[in-house]
Amino acid sequence: MYLFYVLLSSLFLSALIYVIGKSHPNLFMFISLFVNVVTILYLVFKDYGQYIIAKPINT
């Protein structure tokens, strides 16, 4: 169910980014770079992700 939600939201974001890219190429470059960075961070910290979501870090 969680995986389905992630897939659906990524498809929605892809469509949104495509529409923005058509009208604002510079913004499109920034967003695509941001998405790539977030994806890499997610893949690196995948093991910690569920722990952080379940138990927010208290400072």
From Swiss-Prot:
Chain ranges on the Cytoplasmic side, renumbered to this chain: 46-59
Transmembrane intervals: 25-45
Subcellular location field: Host membrane
Keywords: Host membrane, Membrane, Signal, Transmembrane, Transmembrane helix
Signal peptide: 1-21
Listed GO CC annotations: host cell membrane; membrane
Main location: host cell
Transcription found in the keyword field: no
Protein name: Uncharacterized protein ORF59
Cystine residue pairs: none
Extracellular-side segments: 22-24
Tree of life domain: Viruses
Topological type in the membrane: Single-pass type I membrane protein
Record flagged with keyword Membrane: yes
